[in-house]
């Protein structure tokens, strides 16, 4: 277990890798759920990502809330649970997801960075980060991902901000936050 306001359960593989000082890469789980990609593309993406991390010599650590427990590292027998999940969990939702014993909460970039940090993992990979939404000047719609990137001591490897966002606004916000 990692320290924090709630416990974080590490898989045996992730725990052993960290104890042995081997590389571990945290992964979000929203993209692998039906909230991120339709089936069967979500399962194919999951397999490709896990294989890519392993072929690079690291241990993949999928983050999620499973049966009310914040998890870092899932076994193959748990993959179906995230593939079919429909409850997205951001960093603000982690305490609720754990306290209310959500059956499955797939994690956003912000939640994944938080769980990775609590677990002592310093590298996180994702396809795209959230950012400043178009029209944010009126709506205030800015992803929690940006705040997490600024505050969690975890390197994020990503293709960049999602294309539907206000990319200029996202870059400005990242600059303001010192990212």
Where are these regions (language model features)?
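Short, basic, glycine/proline-bearing loop/turn elements
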Residues: 1-3, 35, 90-102, 152-159
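N-terminal glycine-/serine-/threonine-rich phosphate-binding loop
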Residues: 1-55, 118
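Catalytic-core regions of core metabolic enzymes
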Residues: 4-15, 38, 104, 138, ...
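General beta-strand structural signal in soluble alpha/beta enzymes
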Residues: 25-27, 60-65, 98, 104-106, ...
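Glycine-rich nucleotide/cofactor/substrate-binding loop typically near the N-terminus or early
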Residues: 29-39, 43-98
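Glycine-rich oxoanion-binding loops at beta->alpha junctions
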Residues: 87-111, 138-140
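C-terminal binding/interaction regions
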Residues: 114
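Phosphate/pyrophosphate-binding betaalpha-module
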Residues: 119-179
């Amino acid at each position: 277990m990692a320290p924090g306001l709630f416990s974080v359960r590490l898989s045996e593989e992730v725990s052993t890798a960290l104890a042995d000082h081997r590389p571990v890469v945290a992964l979000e789980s929203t993209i692998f759920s039906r909230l991120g990609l339709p089936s069967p593309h979500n399962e194919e993406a999951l397999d490709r990502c896990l294989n890519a991390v392993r072929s690079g010599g690291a241990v993949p650590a999928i983050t999620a809330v499973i049966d009310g427990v914040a998890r870092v590292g899932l076994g193959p027998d748990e993959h179906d649970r995230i593939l079919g999940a429909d409850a997205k969990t951001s960093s603000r939702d982690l305490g609720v997801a754990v306290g209310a014993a959500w059956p499955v909460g797939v994690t956003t970039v912000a939640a994944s960075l938080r769980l990775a940090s609590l677990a002592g993992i310093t590298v996180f990979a994702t396809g795209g980060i959230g950012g400043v939404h178009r029209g944010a000047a009126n709506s205030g719609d800015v992803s929690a991902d940006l705040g997490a990137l600024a505050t969690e001591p975890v390197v994020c490897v990503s293709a960049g901000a999602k294309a539907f966002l206000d990319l200029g606004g996202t870059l400005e916000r990242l600059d303001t936050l010192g990212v």
